[in-house]
Amino acid sequence: MEQLANPISEQVREVGEAVAEALPVPKPDELSPSAISSSFEAEALRSEIIRVGRKLWERQYVDGNGGNISCRLGTKYVLCTPTMMSKRDMEPADICLSDIDGNIVAGDRLRTSELLLHLEIYRANPRARAVVHCHPPYATAFSLTGTPPPVGLISEYEIFIGPAALARYETPGTHAFAETVLPFVQNHNTILLANHGVVCWSDTVTHAEWLTEILESYCKTCVIAKQIGKPLTSIPDDKIQEILVLKRKLGFPDARMEPLPAPDAASAPVNRELEKLVRQVVSRLEER
């Protein structure tokens, strides 16, 4: 039997939607550092950073206190991992809140010394919302040779990454080190850091970590293929062009394509706290 609509529930839902539309939605940039640090969005991002940090440690992409992770919170703030702490052991209170200039505005720990690298990426490319830097063995091995991994061999790698850039060596933590990625940030989401490691950017921390996995797996496969002693077979050029068409539709950068357009500011994420609150209110009213 067809279930009859509940007119009271419909009215409550309409009221909830009207409230959500009528209330001013504060953006992260409009909140104080303490308010944004304790916001629902910040809590969710901290959890994601912690989860990805442990994943990097489990995959042996970091050791000791190595590697760092960050993500943007609005346009003025950045959440980042602390210095001198294993990515295995992080808790929510350990994650630092910094402004876009690298000044700590909330949190009890000192920020990672390599945050300057992340900030240069954010300033140079508005599409970058999260950055993961680590030292996966096979990819780092390529950085020691001064040669990026070859291209045109595996379709998945071509779609998500393609040509990986190789930035020159500079002392980690310095402004000179941070600026080494600037020539590549527009057309590369994955950059090898000479004699150091890898940095990847994406729209989320999870996706930036995916790029790290894809790069490391690809570098490992290339090393194994070379050991077989047979010539490597490349994907035909016309098929690479098909991949580039797909890649542009998906919004992945590639040095073989024109730079992607800047993201539309109107497509910024909605305030998740307000949305959650309205849903809770509507749900409770419907239960009465």
Describe each region flagged by the PLM.
Residues 2-288:
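Glycine-rich flexible loops
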